[in-house]
Swiss-Prot record:
EC id: 6.-.-.-
Pfam name, any one: Rossmann-like_BshC
Function of the molecule: Involved in bacillithiol (BSH) biosynthesis. May catalyze the last step of the pathway, the addition of cysteine to glucosamine malate (GlcN-Mal) to generate BSH.
Coiled coil: 249-270
Intrachain disulfide bonds: none
Top enzyme class: ligase
Name assigned to this protein: Putative cysteine ligase BshC
A GO term, aspect molecular function: ligase activity
Keywords: Coiled coil, Ligase
Family according to the record: Belongs to the BshC family.
Length: 539
């Protein structure tokens, strides 16, 4: 296994400037991630703050007991140490861990925590925030597998889910096992297939919900690393969140104003905000009849129009006090909850998260908080040996494929494969027939002027017939050189499937099935660098 790096620029201008230090970013962030002094400064700032360490450790101890992990228990006890801090990142609870970027983010969290623990000489705990409150089920109920014509979405069908949070979505054991076996039927059987399938079925048997299944698999993959899981949808954590929920209700209009101001500043700087939040949003969700609804506000009242609920501010504060388990954060307030509960040395973010966190600085200031340093996660591409060998044969580089895909080179190759004499003959036929048809058209219109539409259709028909012949010949050339076409398709499907980064489409199980547990152990411990470059792992 070999690790190399490539500099591939983001298409998002805000991310590009953030990574490349093109503009002063203090307007949007509290810390400069490029400064070597940032981590000590952030640590000193955290030591001046107060966190519910004992209550948090007690809760985490109870939640993680089911995993029976010594490494987890050790890190949970570190929470009680007032010197300890955390590296935090999160994601939705996708099936089989979801796209590869979830695995890459977890590796980022663990490796950066180890690096800073050595550098600062204090306990640094890796924490993965599981978005158990998320109710966008269609974003997590599938994986992609490889089909004859590229990636195929393998979806686990669900019934009567409504707007339930992931933590509440029950897993039908029988249906999920059938789905899992269907996924594995698309993989080539290897020496590792049976053991991996048994391991996943064991995780499934222990799971009641989507979130459970996700957590058991993550625990299996990273148990020895002591990764802690913070399930934001778990009812046990809600009493710890009560205080901030109240502050959000009490100063709701100011939260909205600060967001609007930050987004306006971002637009003035030439960037595009991505948070879609109207002035009537209260930035909190409320669970009613096992569904999750966004609370809105107007004229001093809070309401959920879909179910006819309404509160005054005082009534809503009372509801938070008595039933914090009914409330959850939205994209605006989740970072605030993280900052108040967890001593976060660094937040490990995807590019989209970097963008939206940049819209929240004013809200952090309103709550007298500093936003944790927002560090872009590792972006990794796995380059399999058979793909690596095909690249030079097809005159492609990894950088070229990741940046532009293969279509241009593929089309150029087949254009060159058509004999020039044939292409010229078709073009000549088009010109000659067009000229002949023009003469005929003129004669026909002198006899019957109303034939103009008929003649237009006739000309189009003749042109289409020539194009039909051209396409049939081109198709036959492609068939004769099918192995070349398949090379281009295999390269594309591996490195840039569906014109997207590999890590956004493929799932880790394909690689675990093909290369086994030792591959993953080596992979997750590679010496990745946090220099905001594309990490290329050659197998």
């Amino acid at each position: 296994m070999q690790l190399t790096e490539l500099s591939i620029r983001s298409q998002n201008l805000f991310i590009r400037d953030y990574i490349e230090e093109k503009k002063e970013m203090t307007t949007f962030f509290d810390y400069d991630i490029h400064s070597e002094h940032t981590w000590k400064k952030r640590y000193d700032d955290l030591m001046k703050m107060s966190f519910p360490r004992e209550a948090l450790a007690d809760y985490m101890s109870a939640y993680h007991a089911k995993f029976e992990s010594a490494a987890m228990r050790q890190n949970i006890e570190k929470i009680r140490d007032k010197r300890s801090v955390m590296v935090v990142g999160g994601q939705q609870a996708g099936l089989l861990t979801g796209p590869l970027y979830t695995i890459h983010k977890i590796i980022s969290i663990i490796q950066f925590a180890k690096e800073k623990e050595t550098e600062l000489g204090v306990p640094v705990i890796p924490v993965f925030w599981v978005a158990g409150e998320d109710h966008d089920v269609d974003e997590i109920n599938f994986v992609y597998t490889s089909g004859e014509k590229g990636p195929v979405k393998q979806k686990l069908s669900l019934h009567n889910v409504k707007k339930a949070a992931a933590k509440r979505i029950p897993l039908d054991q029988e249906k999920t096992e059938i789905w899992l076996r269907d996924v594995f039927s698309t993989y080539e059987e290897s020496a590792y297939t049976n053991d991996l399938l048994v391991q996943l079925l064991r995780c499934l048997r222990k799971s009641q919900t989507f979130t459970d299944f996700f957590e058991w698999i993550v625990c299996d993959l990273f148990e020895e690393d002591g990764l802690l899981l913070f399930n934001s949808g778990d009812l046990g954590v809600k009493p710890l969140e009560r205080t901030l929920f109240k502050h959000i209700v009490e100063t709701n209009d100011e939260v909205t104003n600060r967001l609007n101001e930050s987004q306006a500043a971002m637009k003035r700087a030439g960037y595009q905000p991505i948070i879609e939040a109207g002035d009537n949003q209260a930035n909190l969700f409320y669970e009613y009849d096992e569904e999750r609804f966004l609370i809105e506000k107007e004229n001093g009242r809070f309401f959920i129009s879909e179910v006819g609920l309404t509160w005054t501010k005082e009534e809503l504060l009372k509801e938070v006090e008595e039933h914090p388990e009914r409330f959850s954060n939205n994209v605006v307030t989740r970072p605030l909850m993280q900052e108040t509960l967890l001593p976060t040395l660094a937040f490990m973010a995807g590019h989209g998260e970097v963008n939206y966190w940049g819209e929240l600085k004013g809200i952090f200031e309103h709550f007298h908080l500093k936003m944790a340093p927002v560090l872009p996660r590792l972006h990794v591409t796995i380059l399999e040996r058979h793909i690596d060998k095909k690249l030079p044969v097809r005159e492609l580089s990894v950088e070229e494929v990741l940046t532009n895909g293969v279509k241009e080179k593929k089309d150029a190759h087949f254009q060159q494969s058509l004999p020039d004499s044939f292409v010229q003959a078709v073009e000549h036929a088009k010109r000659e027939l067009a000229n002949a048809h023009g003469v005929m058209r003129q004669e026909a219109l002198e006899i019957e002027p109303n034939f103009e539409q008929l003649l237009d259709k006739n000309a189009k028909f003749i042109e289409d017939q020539l194009q039909f012949v051209y396409q049939k010949v081109a198709q036959r050339v492609e068939e004769k050189e099918g192995y070349i076409l398949r090379d281009f398709e295999r390269i594309e499907n591996s490195l840039k499937p569906l014109d997207a980064p590999q890590e956004r489409i493929w799932n880790i199980m394909y690689f675990l099935n093909k290369y086994g547990p030792e591959f993953f152990k080596t992979f997750k411990n590679l010496p990745f660098s946090f220099q905001n470059k594309q990490q290329i792992v050659k197998l």
